[in-house]
Design a protein with these regions (language model features):
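Short acidic/glycine-enriched loop/turn segments that link adjacent beta-strands
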Residues: 105-109
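Short, charge-patterned binding micro-sites
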Residues: 24-30
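Generic detection of short hydrophobic beta-strand segments and adjacent strand-loop junctions
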Residues: 20-22
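Glyoxalase I/VOC metalloenzyme domain signal
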Residues: 1-18, 31-97, 114-160
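Short Asp/Glu-rich motifs
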Residues: 28, 110-111
Length: 160
C-alpha cells in the first residue's frame, strides 16, 4: 500500500488519499462460499476519477488474493455508478457471475462480477448511501483544494 500511495501521490499527483481499515463485513461470499476478508483501503481523486487502492490484511480466499496470484499488483476492478439492481441484471444477462459480494455495515449491498475474460478484471456494483456520496464529495473537494504536496495521506477521520 505504501509504495502504491507514493506512486499515485508523488508521480501522478492524485490525492490526497484517505486511508481506513475495513473490518470483516457481514455476509461475504467468494465464489459461492462464505469468507471473511479484511481490507486496508485508500480513496483519492485524480480530476473526476475516484481511485481506490486496496490491500487485504488477512489470509482469506477472495477476489483480491485471486488477482494477486493471477497477475500480481495492479488493476483489479472498476465500479459502475448505476442502480445496483439494474447492474446486477445487466451483467448477469451477459453471463458474468458474482465472484464476491457482501453488505456494508450501513446495509448497502456490493458485488464484484467476474469479467476477467472480457476486460482483465472485475466490475463492482454498490448501493451508495447518501452518507457515502457525501464522503466522496468531500474527498473530491479536498482533491480540488490540494496543493499536490502537503499531507498526501490522511485519515478518514479528517473528512469530518
Amino acid at each position: 500500500m505504501d509504495r502504491a500511495l507514493d506512486h499515485w501521490t508523488r508521480v501522478i499527483k492524485a490525492g490526497p488519499f484517505f486511508v481506513f481499515d475495513v473490518p470483516v463485513l457481514p455476509g461475504q461470499i467468494y465464489r459461492g462460499e462464505p469468507t471473511q476478508v479484511a481490507l486496508k483501503v485508500a480513496f483519492g481523486f485524480s480530476g473526476g476519477l475516484l481511485i481506490e487502492l486496496l490491500q487485504q490484511t488477512n489470509e482469506r480466499p477472495s477476489v483480491f488474493t485471486e488477482m494477486l496470484d493471477r497477475s500480481g499488483e495492479g488493476y483489479h476492478h472498476v465500479m459502475l455508478r448505476i442502480p445496483y439492481e439494474e447492474g446486477v441484471q445487466r451483467l448477469s444477462a451477459e453471463g458474468h457471475e458474482i465472484a464476491f459480494s457482501g453488505t456494508m455495515p450501513s446495509g448497502e449491498r456490493f458485488a464484484l462480477f467476474d469479467t476477467l475474460a472480457a476486460n482483465g478484471g472485475f466490475i463492482e456494483l454498490m448501493e451508495l448511501s447518501g452518507a457515502m456520496e457525501a464522503s466522496l464529495q468531500r474527498m473530491h473537494a479536498a482533491h480540488l483544494e490540494w496543493d499536490g504536496i502537503s499531507r498526501p495521506i490522511r485519515a478518514i477521520a479528517d473528512l469530518a
